[in-house]
UniProtKB/Swiss-Prot annotation:
It is found in: Plastid, Chloroplast. It comes from Ipomoea purpurea (Common morning glory). This is DNA-directed RNA polymerase subunit alpha. It catalyses: RNA(n) + a ribonucleoside 5'-triphosphate = RNA(n+1) + diphosphate. Pfam families: RNA_pol_A_bac, RNA_pol_A_CTD, RNA_pol_L. Keywords: Chloroplast, DNA-directed RNA polymerase, Nucleotidyltransferase, Plastid, Transcription, Transferase. Belongs to the RNA polymerase alpha chain family. DNA-dependent RNA polymerase catalyzes the transcription of DNA into RNA using the four ribonucleoside triphosphates as substrates. SMART domains: RPOLD. NCBIfam families: rpoA. One of its GO terms (cellular component) is DNA-directed RNA polymerase complex. One of its GO terms (molecular function) is protein dimerization activity. In plastids the minimal PEP RNA polymerase catalytic core is composed of four subunits: alpha, beta, beta', and beta''. When a (nuclear-encoded) sigma factor is associated with the core the holoenzyme is formed, which can initiate transcription. The lineage of its organism: Eukaryota, Viridiplantae, Streptophyta, Embryophyta, Tracheophyta.
Amino acid sequence: MIREKVTVSTRTLQWKCVESRTDSKRLYYGRFILSPLMKGQADTIGIAMRRALLGEIEGTCITRVKSEKAPHEYSTIAGIQESVHEILMNLKEIVLRSNLYGTCDASICVKGPGCVTAEDIILPPSVEIVDNTQHIAWLTEPIDFCIGLQIERNRGYILKTHHNFEDGSYPIDAVFMPVRNANHSIHSYGNGNEKQEILFLEIWTNGSLTPKEALHEASRNLIDLFIPFLHMEEENLHLEDGEHTIPLSPLSFHDKVAKLRKNKKKLALKSIFIDQLEFPPKIYNCLKKSNISTLLDLLNKSQEDLMKIEHFHIEDVKQILGILEKHFAIDLPKNQF
């Protein structure tokens, strides 16, 4: 366990990890402070950060199991101590860490007797198990235990749908939430108009992320939410007599395209985000992971730069070039492949 003495800066806004410990392979704890803040700022940041930590961070789960030997979810299989339902619940608890995009397949194939644990899961290279000792099933007889698994990376939670059980495929309620809990508290100091605040933030994770990693990802997600407001252009708004409201009329995507074609200002480039460019999910996720969020970011990359992105192929680059040509009649610098 690491614990540091809390020292408060009186000038520059600073954050610091003041306590960090690992209670188990599946329970990490971290405590952070941010100071000095003006009165009211700590609560604003604390509420937003807690919501982002609990709801905006992606996690990886087993979402579906396939077995030809199980007639239904509540059946039992000869030679296995647990029912099918109990095995599904054990698989639901497996904690995974990954840089996966979308879904992938995994499997278990073990011969009894013996204990089946998370260590027996055959995974793709992009996925790893946090705790290999997690129990899945007990095989009491010399039988073959072979099942297929679907693994998915997402956020929030997804409730299983009760259909398509005839092929031996069983969906699992998935909780894509690596942060188990998050709390914030506020300490005030100073007098009168000089009163300031310290924000204390506590984070518990399931081991797939450290609290510091979770804090970084939550902060990045919050920043992404506010970026559009930084790039809004000021427009001349006129009020008629008796009007007390100003209608906001942000540029539509097609307006931005027209403006880009006309003068190609950096401001227009910055205000077009890649989620507006009709990219397939794989391309969009890969670009976001590489910190490419706007059209300006993309145009600053060459074709060779894009080919260096993990999981990217020449077909993906060609698709990006086609979309840029379609909407903007522009191209990325060409390289020889």
